[in-house]
């Protein structure tokens, strides 16, 4: 079995754009769709999503176009070998481009095996719990109203994108914990990598006491020492 062709598209919906933190403009959401076809007619599909500040992005799709020739004529089931050959070398490769290829190759492997990918990997569940994720809203009352709407739709977990200002975020966290029963709905806070270490620890301790389920991305992703400090 060999890869015969690859198709990649960047698509963007004409929807309202949202802010995720006070220091960011409204974000443009772009989906990059990838399809890998074999000469036997088997197909693997994937999609990755990016947010950018000043326009829709094409760099993920363009990066895949540069990588695609390496994959043509190769065995799609040899994922580790393929990944070694497409690793970043002469020019940087966006992680999203590598992720799209990886997901499509796994999807293709599931189609070859004739079973859903989760089943091929040993999964025993036929459904998973979902959570809703908010944009940044203007004030606490707007968040409380939004949570009410999400509960009416059947959600039992909500992740907050907020102003990413510790005191304002704590004000919201206290308000939702007071207004709603945290034994029946889970809350999570996403700080979008905006906090300093001291603020991260302070906020983490308080929202833990408030019954929040998790605290996402308080520090820059590569601040490994900071995350070690937070998790001691």
Language model regions located:
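Structured beta-strand/loop patches that form or line metal/cofactor-binding pockets in enzymes
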Residues: 1-45, 49-53
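Metal- or metallocofactor-binding catalytic centers and their adjacent structured scaffolds
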Residues: 5, 37-112
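Glycine-rich, aromatic-flanked loop segments that form ligand/cofactor-binding clefts
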Residues: 93-96, 102-137
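Short, well-ordered coil/turn segments that N-cap beta-strands
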Residues: 95, 124-130, 154-156, 181-185, ...
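Active-site mouth loops of central-metabolism enzymes
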Residues: 127-142, 161-162, 191-197
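Non-catalytic positions within long, well-ordered alpha-helices that form the structural scaffold/packing
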Residues: 148-151, 208
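Catalytic core of soluble alpha/beta enzymes
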Residues: 160-163, 167-232
């Amino acid at each position: 079995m060999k890869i015969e062709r690859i198709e990649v598209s960047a698509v963007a919906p004409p929807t309202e754009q949202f802010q995720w933190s006070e220091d960011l403009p409204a974000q443009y959401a772009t989906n990059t769709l990838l399809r890998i076809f074999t000469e036997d007619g088997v197909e693997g599909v994937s999609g990755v999503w990016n947010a950018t500040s000043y326009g829709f992005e094409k760099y993920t799709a363009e990066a895949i176009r540069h990588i695609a020739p390496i994959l043509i004529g190769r065995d799609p089931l040899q994922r580790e070998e393929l990944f070694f050959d497409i690793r970043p070398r002469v020019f940087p490769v966006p992680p999203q481009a590598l992720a799209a290829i990886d997901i499509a190759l796994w999807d293709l492997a599931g189609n070859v095996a004739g079973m859903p990918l989760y089943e091929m990997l040993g999964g025993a569940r036929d459904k998973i719990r979902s959570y809703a994720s908010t944009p940044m809203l203007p004030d606490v009352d707007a968040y409380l109203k939004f949570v009410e709407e999400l509960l009416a739709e059947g959600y039992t977990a909500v992740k907050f994108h907020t102003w990413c200002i510790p005191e304002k975020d704590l004000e919201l966290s206290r308000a939702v914990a007071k207004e709603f029963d945290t034994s029946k709905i889970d809350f999570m806070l996403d700080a979008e990598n905006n906090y300093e270490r001291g603020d991260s620890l302070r906020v983490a301790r308080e929202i833990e006491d408030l019954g929040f389920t998790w605290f996402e991305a308080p520090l820059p992703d590569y601040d490994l020492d900071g995350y070690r400090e937070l998790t001691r």
